[in-house]
């Protein structure tokens, strides 16, 4: 989705989130990287992680999610604030194992920005386990 399309910034951000989830659950690394701006940042507790490039992002996710992770779902997504080039989303995230049992549930703030000609995730602050 480009910045010039008639949809709102919030609609663009929500479309990024949908693409992100499908790419993550499909383990499609290139598609997942396309939903992120790099460098990409994640704050958990007081630890700030940074991925300068896409190369290690998916392998790092698998390490964070654990061996039992099979898929992720957004339980809720609420638009908190939007401008022409930035959207803040509060997301409640569920992670499931191969038996579709809930293995993690946490809140996260996602910042979706329009830069370099595309909408993508720039930063998130998560209440996930470290």
Feature map (PLM): residue ranges:
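A solvent-exposed, acidic/Ser-Thr-rich amphipathic alpha-helical stretch
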Residues: 29-81
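Short beta-strand segments enriched in hydrophobic/aromatic residues
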Residues: 36-37, 93-95, 125-126
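Residue-level preference for beta-strand/loop junctions
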Residues: 71, 85-87, 104
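Short beta-strand edge/turn micro-motifs at domain boundaries
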Residues: 103-130
């Amino acid at each position: 989705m480009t910045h010039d399309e008639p949809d709102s910034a919030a609609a663009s951000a929500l479309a990024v989130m949908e693409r992100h989830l499908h790419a993550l659950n499909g383990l499609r690394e290139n598609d997942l990287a396309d939903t992120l701006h790099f460098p990409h940042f994640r704050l958990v507790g007081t630890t700030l992680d940074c991925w300068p490039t896409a190369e290690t992002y998916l392998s790092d996710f698998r390490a964070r999610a654990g061996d039992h992770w099979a898929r992720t779902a957004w339980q809720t997504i609420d638009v908190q604030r939007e401008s022409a080039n930035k959207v803040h989303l509060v997301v409640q995230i569920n992670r499931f194992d191969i038996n579709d049992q809930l293995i993690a549930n946490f809140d996260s703030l996602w910042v979706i920005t329009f830069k370099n000609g595309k909408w993508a995730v720039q930063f998130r602050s998560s209440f996930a386990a470290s």
